């Protein structure tokens, strides 16, 4: 078949493609569907909200209620900002960490996906032919158009090699604003 699989619909933990083949959906929309596809409670809540409006550029009362709930669960949260995507959340966090620390660089795990922001996608698709030295992974552009400045400001640490990662972080500690980590990085070969 010359084409990728196209989804027709999903139910629970399964997705059925346009040819009627049903599969377990291990991706779950990049882990955002923790309740599975078309969970009745979720469908009911979303349907009720759609009668009130589908999207707003303004804040809503539901955001305040949800923010207060999150704040009540973690005493260290001071403020919450809702955004439209994980990419936007990562962009805001990286900018905030740079502003707070006054440091220019970030560190991230080789192969981990954190969205489509130039800095977050560095070394997302690295391969053995561009890994660099074992103790010093290279910053690799995911595609043409990534500025050299983004590559220069991202320190890449290896996945599942704590001592090497700590050594690299220690080497760059004076320049690092933050370390971008995904505890379940599905794109680096982690199989839960």
Predicted regions span which residues?
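Short beta-strands and strand-loop turn motifs
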Residues: 24-27, 178-184
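Residue-level signal for inorganic ion chemistry
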Residues: 46, 154, 179
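Glycine-rich loop-to-alpha-helix module at the N-terminal edge of alpha/beta enzyme cores
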Residues: 22-104
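Active-site core of PLP-dependent enzymes with the aminotransferase class I/II
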Residues: 161-168, 184-192
